[in-house]
């Protein structure tokens, strides 16, 4: 817990074998990844020269219907949230293992959301109804060296949604934004994405850019070469 961590840092609590085991188990389950520890030479030089990312576009908050669509179609298809809630409670008798799996998934999602909101690493992207695409946009920027660039495929909401206004204002005002190419999916560049959905090729850089390139309402990458 946070309280235990604070006591450990000031030497008021001894590290027990039980604590070591708990940390090892948590690490195995959460699959912790620390970029500077994994790539010490890269970060000794300031970061990556090139970062390319096509991150997931998903809400961190657990979606009940999505979870049960995989595990129990009947619950997923419930007509209302209230009915679905009753069916979930009923799992305590009919399928306690599934209920436990649901509660664990819900806890993991809430813990992830809490970390993204409060850790300080994602101050401008781990906000609102936290979405992974914004988190990855912020991460891509933080991994990039002063001379490097990060290219990320994200929903255009990174630039237009009120939730991320502080992030986009920061990359614009500091000169970290190199380009934003906005696409509509009317020609189904992404088959699984709704045709009305808008996404962008976002390029961020370490060095301050004097000029920024923008394009909007594109439908094909070939249009980027149009003058």
Where do the protein language model's features map onto the residues?
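Conserved helicase NTPase catalytic core signature
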Residues: 1-40
């Amino acid at each position: 817990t946070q309280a235990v961590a604070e006591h450990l840092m000031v030497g008021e609590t001894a590290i027990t074998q039980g604590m070591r085991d708990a940390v090892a188990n948590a690490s195995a389950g959460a699959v912790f990844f620390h970029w500077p520890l994994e790539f010490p030479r890269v970060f000794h030089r300031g970061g990556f020269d090139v970062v390319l990312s096509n991150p997931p576009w998903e809400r961190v908050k657990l979606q009940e219907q999505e979870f049960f669509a995989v595990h129990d179609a009947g619950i997923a298809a419930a007509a209302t949230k209230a009915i679905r809630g009753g069916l979930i409670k009923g799992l305590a008798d009919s399928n306690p293992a599934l209920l436990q799996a649901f509660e664990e998934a819900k806890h993991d999602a809430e813990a992830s959301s809490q970390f993204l909101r409060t850790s300080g690493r994602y101050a401008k992207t781990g906000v609102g109804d936290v979405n992974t695409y914004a988190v990855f946009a912020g991460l891509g920027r933080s991994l990039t060296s002063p001379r490097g660039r990060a290219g990320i495929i994200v929903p255009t909401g990174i630039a237009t949604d009120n939730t991320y206004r502080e992030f986009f204002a920061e990359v614009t005002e500091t000169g970290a934004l190199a380009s934003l190419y906005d696409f509509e999916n009317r020609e189904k560049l992404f088959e699984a994405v709704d045709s009305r959905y808008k996404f962008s090729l976002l390029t961020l850089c370490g060095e301050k850019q004097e000029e920024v390139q923008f394009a909007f309402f594109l439908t094909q990458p070939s249009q980027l070469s149009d003058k």
